[in-house]
């Protein structure tokens, strides 16, 4: 079992959360002006970075609020969590972490 820190509720079991994809993806200003190829790239193509990655999560079994997390994709360790709308925290690769 892994505990995930909800910024609203505190640490909770991983089963209470759902993954929501990459965080901080800007919505196109005029989606109607995009070609099919550009629209598909926006919808389906995301980074698959090794290391610290910004992700969206929802606490579906608790407060039902969305938040962002910085997670190490190699170790699965959450380095930081922060509310949606807040700026991404700057971390050194050795900072933070919960397992």
Curated annotation (Swiss-Prot):
GO BP annotation list: tetrahydrofolate metabolic process
Main location class: cytoplasm
Membrane-crossing residue ranges in chain numbering: none
InterPro entries registered for this protein in UniProt: SoxD (IPR006279), SoxD_sf (IPR038561)
Record bears the keyword Zinc: yes
GO molecular function: metal ion binding; sarcosine oxidase activity
E.C. number(s) listed in UniProt: 1.5.3.24
Record-listed Zn(2+) binding positions: 6, 9, 59, 63
One Pfam family per UniProt: SoxD
Activity-pH dependence: Optimum pH is 7.7 in potassium phosphate buffer and 8.0-8.5 in glycylglycine buffer.
Coiled coil: none
Keyword Isomerase assigned: no
Modulation of this protein's activity: Inhibited by Zn(2+), Cu(2+), Cd(2+), Hg(2+), Ag(+), p-chloromercuribenzoate (p-CMB), iodoacetamide, N-ethylmaleimide, CN(-), o-phenanthroline and sodium lauryl sulfate.
Cellular localization per UniProt: Cytoplasm
A GO cellular component entry from the record: cytoplasm
Keyword list, A-Z: Cytoplasm, Metal-binding, Oxidoreductase, Zinc
Catalysed reaction equations from the record: sarcosine + (6S)-5,6,7,8-tetrahydrofolate + O2 = (6R)-5,10-methylene-5,6,7,8-tetrahydrofolate + glycine + H2O2; sarcosine + O2 + H2O = formaldehyde + glycine + H2O2
Cited function: In the presence of tetrahydrofolate, catalyzes the oxidative demethylation of sarcosine to yield glycine, 5,10-methylenetetrahydrofolate and hydrogen peroxide. In the absence of tetrahydrofolate, catalyzes the oxidative demethylation of sarcosine to yield glycine, formaldehyde and hydrogen peroxide. Can also use N-methyl-L-alanine and N-ethyl-L-glycine. Is very specific for oxygen as an acceptor.
Subunit note: Heterotetramer composed of subunits alpha (SoxA), beta (SoxB), gamma (SoxG) and delta (SoxD).
Family (UniProt): Belongs to the SoxD family.
Protein known as: Sarcosine oxidase subunit delta
Highest classification ranks of the organism: Bacteria, Bacillati, Actinomycetota, Actinomycetes, Mycobacteriales
Gene of this entry: soxD
